[in-house]
C-alpha cells in the first residue's frame, strides 16, 4: 500500500495529484505555476531588485526582469541567471547585472534591494496545497515533472539539444519510464531538474 504525490510544473499551471492506493482516495489541485507566481511577485513591487535562487522555468520571469532593468537596477546571482539564459553576456546585454552567488548573498544581507528567490519548488506552498486535501504531508512516492531543455553546447538550440538527449536515451531503452530519474540520478546537463531534486 502506497501514498503518492505527483506534481507537474508547467508554464501556466502546477498540477498536484495525491493518490492513496489503500483506499483509492485521490485529490487533485490545479494552481498557478511557480513561474507565474514569481513573475507576479516581481510585478507587484518596483525599484531595484536582487534575484537569487536556482534555475527554474523562465518565460514570464525573463520578460518582467528585462522590463524592470529598463527602469531600475536588476542584479541576478549566477545560479539564478540560468533561468533567464545560459549565456551570461546576453543577460548583461539586457541591462541586468550578473554577480557571483557569494556577492548576491552579501547584497541580500545589506537589504538595499527588494529580494526575490527563484525556484520551481516551494515546499511550504506544496505543503499548504496538500493540507487543503486534508491528508498528512507524508508519501511513499513523490514524483515531479518539469520540462528541462538542458544546457546545450554553443550554437545548438535548446529544443534540438533536449530532443537529441531524449532520442539518445530512448534509442537505448525505448520505454517512457526511461525519462524518469531517481533524485540522485538526474543527468548533469539537466540543471532545472537537478535544482528541483535538491
Description of each model-found segment:
Residues 1-5, 9-11, 17-198:
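Nucleotide/phosphate-binding catalytic cleft detector across ATP-hydrolyzing
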Amino acid at each position: 500500500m502506497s501514498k503518492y504525490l505527483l506534481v507537474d510544473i508547467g508554464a501556466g499551471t502546477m498540477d498536484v495529484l495525491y493518490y492513496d492506493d489503500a483506499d483509492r482516495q485521490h485529490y487533485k489541485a490545479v494552481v498557478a505555476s511557480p513561474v507565474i507566481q514569481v513573475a507576479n511577485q516581481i510585478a507587484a513591487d518596483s525599484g531595484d531588485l536582487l534575484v537569487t535562487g536556482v534555475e527554474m522555468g523562465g518565460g514570464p520571469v525573463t520578460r518582467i526582469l528585462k522590463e524592470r532593468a529598463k527602469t531600475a537596477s536588476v542584479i541576478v546571482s549566477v545560479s539564478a541567471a540560468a533561468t533567464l539564459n545560459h549565456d551570461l553576456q546576453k543577460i548583461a546585454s539586457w541591462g541586468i547585472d550578473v554577480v557571483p552567488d557569494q556577492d548576491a548573498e552579501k547584497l541580500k544581507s545589506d537589504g538595499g534591494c527588494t529580494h526575490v528567490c527563484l525556484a520551481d519548488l516551494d515546499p511550504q506552498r506544496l505543503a499548504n496545497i496538500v493540507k487543503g486535501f486534508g491528508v498528512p504531508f507524508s508519501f511513499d512516492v513523490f514524483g515531479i515533472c518539469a520540462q528541462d531543455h538542458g544546457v546545450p553546447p554553443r550554437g545548438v538550440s535548446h529544443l534540438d539539444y533536449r530532443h537529441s538527449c531524449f532520442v539518445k536515451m530512448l534509442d537505448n531503452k525505448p520505454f517512457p519510464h526511461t525519462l524518469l530519474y531517481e533524485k540522485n540520478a538526474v543527468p548533469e546537463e539537466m540543471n532545472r531538474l537537478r535544482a528541483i531534486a535538491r
